[in-house]
Amino acid sequence: GAPPRRRAMNLPPLREVIARHGLSASKALGQNFLFDEQLLDRIAAIPGDLAGRDVLEIGPGPGGLTRALLRAGASVTAIEMDRRCLPALAELEDAFPGKLRVIEGDAIKIDPATLFAGAYDIVANLPYNVGTALFTGWLAGARGHENDWPPQWRSLTLMFQLEVAQRIVSEPGSGAYGRLAVLAQWRARARLAMKVHRSAFTPPPKVMSAIVHIEPSAMPQGV
């Protein structure tokens, strides 16, 4: 066969993969698929140079963002509970030998610390129905290790509904300021990295989306 880099560059378009596997975004699982490969590459660039780094992706679906992360040189561990998507992800495993590990399961029930020996980045177009719960869990720290800071993750690059993203990065005293901002800014730095128009998704969600990038502070702010 072709060398790995050639194989990786010759991937069929995402739309073709989705059509071939008969995939459609599941409303029950809070899925919205992204097809724009340039946009996906821009998202994968937000955490900085990922070459040789370990990345955790939640809910990869048909693997659009997964491809972009692999193209950026990351080693990706992807947790997916929708088994319809597993054959499409298996094709990516073949195209990027040894660089993608797919775990079928529920991300809420999996402790990332069990998946990585060292530091890792989390990059995800989070399923809307579990996004906030996962996010608050990562910020709070693993049960019994809440005081271990900085955490094992190096950064979080996460897609949310725009309104949720704005709450996360809001300033004290603003109308959006509340629990999410307090949690995000207590011992981390949060910024709104990119807005994503609803038309970028299939099916288009009712609202705009945005990507928040978070890095842990060395010491909790204001302690």
For the regions a language model picked out, list residue spans one by one:
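Catalytic cores of RNA-modifying enzymes
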Residues: 2-223
